[in-house]
Structures are given as structure tokens and as C-alpha cells.
Amino acid sequence: METHILFFILAGLLIAVLIGYSIWSARREKSRIFSNTFSTRPPSSPISNEITADIPTTLNPQGVVAQQPFNTETPADFIQSQQEVENSVKNIRISLQTQEISQPLYQETMPESPSEAYQQNQIQEQTVQVEQVETIEQTTEHNIITLYVVAPEGVQFQGNAIVQNLEMLGFHFGEYQIFHRHLDNPASPVLFSVANMMQPGVFDLARMEQFSTVGLVFFMHLPSVGNDLANLKLMIRTVESFAQSVGGFVLDEQHQIFNDESRQNYLLRVAN
């Protein structure tokens, strides 16, 4: 009889221990889940999709008095160089004949009150100003014809050779520290000009012995003095002669080899 009582007591204690352990385990698991809901670990850095690359040293302006370091350009570098040249050409201002911009006509309406009339006048003035700015920007962008002469890969044009060949072709060093081809003498109007492809785009005649560059840009503003078509033909012949003298290549505005098809496209632009 005592054995059965002892057995029931032990069984009851064992059951109580199991129940207590189960309750304790459940609370511990619940506490662990809630404690991990918010992680204190710092967020990982996002992966950037941007590709960064150092700008080649040959494309950075080093100043006209210092010799530019030699560096072999890749196609991407060359395109970036052309963009810098185009920006430089746009910044070179040559006196041209300007045409008066016609303003659009507006229908007169009877305003209901003086305040409405004032507001309409302000809107019309702002519209005219915006249209004038857009027209001037478009005219400036499309009225510059450019050709490039670039050196072969791994080669640079030397300063003395550049000056000698440009002077033989009738260029004169002048305004903006670049070379110009004039209608007659240096006092006559400019037909077209040539600048350095590398920033800042100018030449220093006092340091031409130390000067070198990967290319030059020839450009002509339209309308030009006299006959635009004749001036463009002269510019094309001059550029091709210069390229042949210095051993370079002629490229068009799309940075492609200037061929017969490119020549016809250039002439059609002026003829139209």
C-alpha cells in the first residue's frame, strides 16, 4: 500500500516538473522571437550601379604654358574630348552680323479689369523673352560648322609644325589667342578659325616649342562673309591640306572619318 502511494507521489511530482518546464520553454521562445523583431545591426551599404572612372590626365587643362602629358586616348576619352572642344568653340565669340528677331503677334482682347490687363502684359513679355532666348541658342548651335584634324594613335602634333603649316595656309594668329583665316589681310573679316582641341583651346606663341596636342578643331560661323558655299569649300580644302601636311586624319562633327559622303552633307547644309 505504501509503495502505491509513493509511486503516485513521484508521478505527480514528475508531471508537475514537466508542466513547469513546458511553460518556461514557451515563455523563453516567445521572448526570443520578440527580441529579434528589430535588429540592432547597422544596415549594409547599398550596391551602387554607377560606374566611376578617373578622367584621363590629357583631357584636364594644364594651362597653355605647360607641356601637356602624353597619354593614349580610348574612344570614350576621344568623345569626351570632342564635347569639351565643342563647348570651347561655342565660347569663342566672333563678331557677326545679327538679324532682328521677329516677335509673335498677339490678339488684343478687352480685359475685364485693369489687374487682368496687367497680368496678360506680364505673361506676354515673359513669353517673348523665352522664345528669343530659345531662338538665339538654336541659331548659335546650328550655325557653326566644325571639322577636326586628329593625330594617329600614340602621336601628337608639335607646336612648331602646327604654326608653320597654318601660316603656309594663310592663317594669322590673332584674337582669342587662336589662328584665323581672313578674307584678305588680318584687318579684314574672318572666314574661319582653328583652335586647340584640348582645353582651354588656345595657343601660346611664346611656348610653341614645348607645345603639343592630339588634334585641332576648325570652325566657321554662318552666315559668313561673302559666299557661304565658297567659304566652306575653301575651309574643307584647307583642312585636308593641313591634315596631309602633319600626317593627321580629318573627322566630321559626328567624329567619323570625313569622306565624300560627309563632304556632300556639309555642302548641302550650306546650299539649303
Curated annotation (Swiss-Prot):
Disulfide bonds, paired cysteine numbers: none
> Keyword Transmembrane helix: yes or no?
yes
- Please give the chief subcellular localization of this protein: membrane
Question: Which of UniProt's keywords are assigned here?
Answer: Cell cycle, Cell division, Cell inner membrane, Cell membrane, Membrane, Transmembrane, Transmembrane helix
The places in or outside the cell where this protein is found are:
Cell inner membrane
Per the UniProt topology annotation, the Cytoplasmic ranges are 26-272
Q: Which residues lie on this side of the membrane: Periplasmic?
A: 1-4
Its cellular-component GO annotations read: cell division site; plasma membrane
Q: Does the keyword Hydrolase apply?
A: no
Q: Which family does it belong to?
A: Belongs to the ZipA family.
Record's protein name: Cell division protein ZipA
Q: Which organism is it from?
A: Glaesserella parasuis serovar 5 (strain SH0165) (Haemophilus parasuis)
Q: Which gene encodes it?
A: zipA
